[in-house]
A protein has these predicted regions:
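Eukaryotic RNA-binding helical-repeat scaffolds
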Residues: 1-464
């Protein structure tokens, strides 16, 4: 070994090594001595004198793998990486499936957020290879696209053709990654979701509890029930019965919360969640009980009270309940689109005659925030928003911008659907103002007329 290292050092000193050889030597010395090796630094110094634009695809791959092995050397070679990214974009059309997945994996592990042009180019190339990726390669590709927050409709189309052919046979983690990708990107594909739902019924016993959760959660997030929903959730219930103690507390909470988003009520298991033993487990696990976890617990509790009157299990103790589901960052409600809200507000002032006749961003006693609340008396007249007595009817306007829907279809996300469902049960009249209707209105007069037809369809409009 000493003679081999000595000989390599001599050839390195003489400058006889090409890029591929330098990469091989760098990998070997990283394994022997780590990233602080003097010889590795010498290798990198010689590589930096080269012009990446002149490298072959094989040399480019070797260099990416070297940098990945040392996790980018803590950002010391940003200029080199950027030059490599620029060159890689020009040769993606020559990349096979293994190279595409490998490079996306490298970009992910090095967190190359500045390399989006390359990520986009690799995604386009991946479309041609979707049917040819191995399970491991496809999982890498999907993981990278989730990491960088990218997808395009050509890739989605290719996945819709491929998933029905692989859902029953691919590695469980690959199938799980498919569902995670569509869920993370808010892409509702009935073709994909139905195929995975069918395979879930037959394969769920071989899945880990984490895989079960990650396959079920997108159904709740996107508010979609497959045709075989009864079989799917019966299988979920069976797994919960047989492997309840195997679930991590947060994972279990995510599964049960996803169920209620699509009106599946796991009553037998919710009672266990509200036990002091489970809540103690939640506190002891990792991040403990953060505000999002408390919101999930509170919404589960509200669901039991509103939709499951036959629930007789323990109550959620008051110290675990929150007052608002609308929180910064990860939230059980999507904040109102400000531009859309301002346009609706302007129309409401003209319709109702004054700003005082409706409340904005009103926190209800039931944790949900109302975009707009209008109060009516017994005769149907609008009351000032400040009135609390003589209120006979409450109207909640849901000003639904694009972020409240799946990215490719006009379907509300699960968290928005449950909000509107609960508000109806609590006595509110729900009136939706979807962006795709409102955006068609061309002037203030049409806005006011639209709002009048939505809110007061059976009454004449007064002119102020």
């Amino acid at each position: 070994m000493v003679r081999l290292v000595s000989g390599s050092q001599e050839r390195l000193d003489q400058g006889y090594l090409n890029i591929a050889q330098l990469c091989d030597l760098g990998q070997a010395m990283l394994a022997l001595e780590g990233p602080d090796s003097v010889m590795v630094e010498q290798v990198m110094s010689q590589i930096q004198k080269q012009e990446p634009a002149q490298w072959s695809l094989a040399e480019l791959r070797a260099m990416y793998k070297l940098l990945q092995s040392a996790v980018g050397f803590d950002g010391k070679y940003c200029d080199l990486l950027n030059a490599m990214h620029t060159h890689a974009v020009t040769v993606t059309s020559h990349m096979n499936s293994a190279t595409v997945s490998e490079l996306l994996g490298v970009l992910t592990s090095l967190d190359q957020t500045q390399a989006m042009p390359l990520v986009i180019s690799l995604c386009k190339r991946a479309v041609r290879h979707v049917a040819h990726f191995t399970d491991e390669e496809l999982a890498l590709v999907l993981g990278a696209l989730m990491h960088f927050g990218h997808s395009d409709h050509y890739f989605v189309d290719a996945m819709e053709k491929h998933v029905p052919t692989m859902a029953f046979t691919s590695h469980p983690e690959t199938v799980t990654k498919v569902m995670q990708f569509f869920g993370r990107r808010n892409i509702l594909s009935p073709v994909v979701f139905n195929a995975v739902a069918e395979s879930f019924v037959y394969r769920a016993e071989e899945y880990t509890t984490s895989q079960v959760a990650r396959q079920i959660m997108p159904f709740g997030k996107l508010g979609y029930l497959p045709p075989n929903a009864a079989d799917v959730f019966r299988k979920v219930e069976t797994i919960l019965h047989t492997r309840f103690s195997h679930f991590q507390p947060r994972t279990l909470l995510n599964v049960l919360h996803s169920c209620i988003l699509v009106e599946r009520f796991p009553v037998n298991f919710v009672s266990k969640l509200f036990s002091s033993y489970f809540l103690q487990q939640l506190q002891e696990q990792g991040t403990g009980i953060d505000r999002y976890v408390l919101a999930q617990l509170t919404q589960l509790y509200m669901t039991m009270k509103l939709e499951c009157p036959y629930y007789e299990g323990p109550r959620l103790l008051s110290q675990y309940r929150i007052k608002s589901f609308l929180t910064p960052g990860h939230s059980l409600e999507t904040p109102v689109d400000i531009h859309l809200y301002n346009s609706v507000k302007s129309g409401l002032v003209d319709l109702l005659g004054a700003r005082s006749y409706f409340g904005s961003k009103v926190l209800s006693p039931y944790c949900y925030t109302l975009d707009v609340e209008i109060k009516l008396d017994e005769d149907g007249y609008v009351l000032p928003a400040s009135y609390h007595d003589e209120v006979h009817k409450r109207i909640a306007l849901c000003i639904d911008g694009p972020k409240r829907y799946t990215s490719n279809k006009r379907q509300l996300l699960g968290k928005e659907a449950i909000k509107q469902r609960h508000l109806r049960l609590l006595g509110y009249e729900i009136i939706q103002i979807p962006f795709y209707e409102f955006d068609k209105l061309r002037n203030q007069a049409s806005v006011v007329e639209y709002l009048h037809q939505k809110i007061f369809p059976h009454s004449y409009r007064l002119s102020w």
